[in-house]
Design a protein with these regions (language model features):
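Intrinsically disordered/low-complexity terminal segments and short unstructured peptides
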Residues: 16, 206-210, 219, 334, ...
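A short, polar/charged loop/turn motif at coil->beta-strand junctions and beta-hairpin connectors
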Residues: 20, 37-40, 153, 340, ...
Length: 369
């Protein structure tokens, strides 16, 4: 009966949230175990009347936790902040000067104890533009009641590539450990390349030359028909992000011709490793199994080591916002150490909680203080 009751409760929780992924908790008689794989659920829907139609980059706010910054890829350049529900706009940031028109990705990071937002103004589909820059500015606080709209004068880092060529790009990420900005090219029938530049405040108007870091995947894996092997070459990269503590790297691609060729790759950084060493060591990481194709899915960002978000451009409606979670390791460790502890269920305010021994956890493995 005990097993049956908990199983029914877990089933109810899956129905309640609209999440059809496997539950994070599995109960076998007297043994409570965690399913440590990532799972996805829709946490919100982006109201395009309140927010942005063409979302090409997102970043979780570090100054005002609980909000997500979203970057517009429309002709009018601005960013907005909303919650993971996406139903209301909390803040709009306008820019006092225009810097290029094709903005493709955004990221957040810390430099000299100050939070910055970075925007990649580097889209070049035809590879004929040659004008590329990284827009950056201090992240503003979000106060929807008093300052729903503000203006900022951004800075920029102008750059060229070390090979002297033009490149199309849609992915940018910032590493808090090395304080380096990474840019990933978007290509169709070849491997994508990673370039970098250390973040500094004193570049001024001088054009900088990026440093080549590495290829993503192995070029020899592509073969004659590269479009049939997008995984190993991992082309069409549209978004990337590094977790705040630098331990994990997400790289997302998007193939709107063959939906099953769209993935998210998760790279785990070893102790003392650089980003380059991690990407080259894990040449063929497994795609996250919980991910499903998103229409024009071009945005991804970390909240913490155990939570990240994706969303996409609007098609013929309001695009969903997806939240990806896995259990915190403390929950896994406690359960492993005490597999026969009493398990109890509590239904509180529509949220199912699991008590394992003394501590209380949500279904996602978050410890309730």
């Amino acid at each position: 009966m005990k097993k049956l009751l908990l199983s029914l409760s877990l089933a109810f929780f899956g129905f309640y949230t609209g999440c059809n992924a496997a539950p994070s908790l599995v109960y076998y008689g007297d043994t409570l175990e965690w399913n440590t794989e990532w799972k996805r659920k829709q946490c919100g829907t982006l109201d395009i009347n309140e927010n942005i139609i063409e979302v090409s980059g997102i970043a979780c706010s570090r100054v005002t936790p609980g909000y997500i910054w979203m970057q517009s890829d429309e002709k009018e350049k601005y960013i907005i902040a909303t919650t993971e529900k996406g139903d209301k706009r909390a803040c709009k940031v306008n820019f006092t000067k225009t810097i290029r028109w094709d903005w493709e990705d955004m990221s957040g990071g810390v430099y000299n104890d100050t939070n910055y937002l970075f925007i990649g103004a580097f889209g070049d589909n035809e590879e004929t533009d040659g004008e590329y820059s990284i827009v950056y500015f201090q992240e503003p606080a979000i106060d929807p009641e008093n300052t729903p709209e503000i203006s900022i004068t951004p800075n920029r880092i102008k750059y060229v590539y070390p090979d002297g060529k033009n490149h199309n790009n849609e992915a940018l990420m910032y590493d808090n450990i090395d304080q380096v900005i990474y840019i990933i090219t978007k290509v169709y029938y070849d491997v994508c390349q990673v370039f970098s530049i250390p973040f500094r405040l004193d570049y001024g108007d001088e054009t900088q030359t990026l440093t080549y870091v590495c290829d993503l995947g192995v070029r020899s894996d592509l073969g004659e028909h590269a479009q049939n092997k997008p995984y190993k070459g991992f082309h069409l990269v549209t978004a990337a992000d590094i977790s705040p503590d630098g331990k994990y790297i997400l790289i997302k691609n998007h193939n709107n011709i063959v939906a099953t060729y769209s993935w998210i790759l998760l790279f785990t950084r070893g102790e003392g490793e650089s980003v380059a060493e991690t990407l080259q060591r894990e040449r063929h990481p497994e795609p996250l199994r919980c991910y499903n194709y998103e229409w024009q899915g071009e945005a991804i960002c970390w909240l913490d080591d155990y939570t990240f978000y994706t969303t996409s451009d609007a098609d013929d409606g309001n695009p969903p916002i997806y939240k990806y979670t896995k259990p915190y390791p403390e929950a896994v460790e406690q359960t492993a150490a005490d597999p026969h502890s009493a398990a109890a269920k509590v239904l509180s305010n529509g949220t199912l909680l699991i008590r394992n021994g003394i501590n209380l956890y949500t279904i996602d493995g978050r410890k309730v203080e």
